[in-house]
Regions:
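N-terminal acidic leader/helix
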Residues: 1-24
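Charged low-complexity stretches with an acidic bias
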Residues: 1-7, 55-71
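Short, structured secondary-structure boundary patches
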Residues: 11, 40-45, 67-70
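Intrinsically disordered or highly flexible coil/loop and linker segments, enriched in small
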Residues: 17-20, 43, 61-65
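A short, compositionally biased N-terminal segment around positions ~18-40 that is enriched
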Residues: 19-39, 68-70
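Short, charge-rich amphipathic interface segments used for partner binding and complex assembly
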Residues: 29-61
């Protein structure tokens, strides 16, 4: 896994379609779903760690974008 799209596609394979209209909210829900897949032993450690790293980096980028938006 290298991108958020890869993670979305992985979650779709297991019947999880996440879209709330709030990008950060979506990412947090994706993180929760990834954690559940790992706890269920569907994902191995490497996939789990990779997915969490990608999601957390994306959350950080999204928060920075929101702070840089000028009104």
């Amino acid at each position: 896994m290298k991108t958020i799209l890869d993670i979305r596609n992985l979650l779709r394979q297991y019947g999880s379609f996440i879209y709330t209209g709030d990008r950060i909210g979506d990412l947090i829900m994706m993180e929760d779903e990834i954690r559940e897949l790992y706890k269920s032993q569907i994902l191995d450690v490497k996939e789990y760690q990779s997915a969490l790293l990608i999601i957390r980096n994306e959350i950080k980028l999204e928060e920075e974008r929101k702070m840089n938006v000028k009104y």
